[in-house]
Amino acid sequence: MSSNATDLTTGFIASIVAIVLFGSNFVPLKKYETGDGMFLQWVLCAAIWLVALVVNLILHCPKFWPFAMVGGCIWATGNIAVVPIIKTIGLGLGILIWGSFNALTGWASSRFGWFGMDAEEVAKPVLNYIGAGLSVVSAFIFLFIKSEIPNNTYSVDTTPLISEHVINKTQDPDPDCSWVDKLSTAQSHLVGCSLAVISGILYGSTFVPIIYIKDHSKRNDSIYAGASQNDLDYIFAHFSGIFLTSTVYFLAYCVAMKNNPKLHPEAVLPGFLSGVLWAIATCCWFIANRSLSAVVSFPIITAGPGFIATMWGVFMFKEIQGRKNYLLMMLAFCIILTGALCTAFSKI
């Protein structure tokens, strides 16, 4: 098997693993109260950093480039909005919105060479454009899929994984509820969608520093001359930026809460597991970037997690029912598959 064929195979396998894990990493948290998410995001980021430490040791501690930490800072900034997004518009819709803007930002910055990066060329640019477009179109189809979970069911075991946020107007206010729980339905939708858009743009920019270093490593006059072309060599710096930034945000939150942060101990282990799953998925994404290039991997990996989250809702939590919903899911899956194939063949 040729080197190019091996790279393609490795890249597509890594992409599949990343899609499955990104679509599943919040599932362990489904049954647990997470409050405003500030404590949870710190636990999740701590798990992410530990995975990076293991990977760094396996790779024999490659050179640490501080600039790669900036990408982690960008990601952590977007990540602090995840819990409010899920609470206001649901996990499925949240993933689909931030995934769409993630895909567009990451694909466009790589394809057109934004932020000082080299523009990436593909063998068949038209197919690449079509694939990127279909990846975004598929996301909007999921907006029409409705959950069948009754609104009067409050058990944590039946809370929809993909649901519309419903506020019980007659329920007594909980003194421990977060600011998100106090929003009206209209405010929740506006805030959730806005945060998802912002998070998506930030997520789509997270690889920019690493790609910038790799591109400038080929220039003798650059301070990054000779830097590694292996994306995994930047994992530790990238994830260190994530953990450092999340820690700063959490400490600032503790100060703002007058040293009385809302902690949810029952969410620690699920949050840690969620962080491990996310970290493994991101390592796979780094491998896909290396094997396929970001202009190919971004549309593929950002389109699939929404579909995986929907599958959890259908087969695990039984929250999506009805012929219309099933037909919409099949249509979305076909579009996702077509977009992924177009993007894949644009590389060949």
Swiss-Prot record:
Q: Which InterPro entries match?
A: Sugar_transport (IPR010651), TMEM144 (IPR012435)
Q: Is Nucleotide-binding given among the entry's keywords?
A: no
Q: Which subcellular locations apply to this protein?
A: Membrane
Protein name, entry field: Transmembrane protein 144
Give the chief site where it resides: membrane
All disulfide bonds of the chain are: none
> Per UniProt, what is one GO molecular function of this protein?
carbohydrate transmembrane transporter activity
Q: Can you name the source organism?
A: Bos taurus
Family to which this protein belongs? Belongs to the TMEM144 family.
What the entry lists under Pfam families is as follows: TMEM144 (PF07857)
Coiled-coil regions, chain positions: none
Q: Does the keyword S-adenosyl-L-methionine apply?
A: no
* Protein topology in the membrane: Multi-pass membrane protein
Q: Which UniProt keywords apply?
A: Membrane, Transmembrane, Transmembrane helix
Query: Membrane-spanning regions, if any?
Result: 8-28, 39-59, 64-86, 93-115, 125-145, 193-213, 235-255, 267-287, 295-315, 326-346
Gene Ontology cellular component annotations, sorted alphabetically: membrane
